[in-house]
From Swiss-Prot:
CDD domains: RRF. Pfam families: RRF. GO terms for cellular component: cytoplasm. InterPro entries: Ribosome_recyc_fac, Ribosome_recyc_fac_dom, RRF_sf. NCBIfam families: frr. Belongs to the RRF family. This is Ribosome-recycling factor. The keyword Cytoplasm applies. One of its GO terms (biological process) is translational termination. Responsible for the release of ribosomes from messenger RNA at the termination of protein biosynthesis. May increase the efficiency of translation by recycling ribosomes from one round of translation to another. It comes from Clostridium botulinum (strain Langeland / NCTC 10281 / Type F).
């Protein structure tokens, strides 16, 4: 029973890290990254479709994203979706491809992005701690099932070690992202 709780904690905490990495990848850092477009969907034949399913997204230069739709009729829908997004990018449509030039980040913009990165990191830490609390509650409920106090204490210590490990990983991910943003 305790093993299942520890396994559940590990899985949930791991998913939190994956979600954090995905969220940070979509934040612009002054250089082109196809993950920036992951959250953007365009209306294509009546349904909202992610851009990466509408065409090939490549990086011909450090600060340029090139979107080559498989269906040229999707060009205007892709362009509208990018304009409506919160990325603040101006697509250039030449009739066959869409170019997105990523502007240089100003010092103020960098600082704002770093604030957002830190906030996202804090949210991930809160999620990890919430998972710890839930798992500790599950372990405490095992007292009713005649599990010894020593086993419960050991399980709580193991959960705390996992929590510390994942919090440390979040700190290193956030630190790396901050360096990436500030060093461009």
């Amino acid at each position: 029973m305790i093993k299942e709780i520890l396994k559940k904690a590990d899985e949930k905490m791991g998913k939190t890290i994956v979600a954090l990495k995905r969220e940070l990848a979509s934040m612009k850092a002054g250089r082109a990254n196809p993950a920036m477009l992951d959250r953007i969907e365009a209306e294509y034949y009546g349904s909202m479709t992610p851009l990466n399913q509408l065409g090939n997204i490549s990086i011909p230069e450090a600060r340029v994203l090139l979107i080559q739709p498989w269906d040229k009729s999707a060009l205007s829908a892709i362009e509208k979706a990018i304009l409506k997004s919160d990325l603040g990018l101006n697509p250039s449509n030449d009739g066959t491809v869409i170019r997105l030039v990523i502007p240089e980040l100003t010092e103020e913009t960098r600082k704002n992005i770093v604030k957002t990165v830190k906030k996202t990191g804090e949210e991930a830490k809160v999620a990890i701690r919430s998972i710890r609390r839930d798992c500790n509650d599950d372990v405490k409920n095992l007292k009713k099932d005649d599990v010894s106090e020593d086993d419960i204490k050991k399980a709580e210590d193991d959960i705390q070690k996992k929590t510390d490990k994942y919090i440390k990983e979040i700190d290193s991910i956030i630190s790396a992202k901050e360096k990436e943003i500030l060093s461009i």
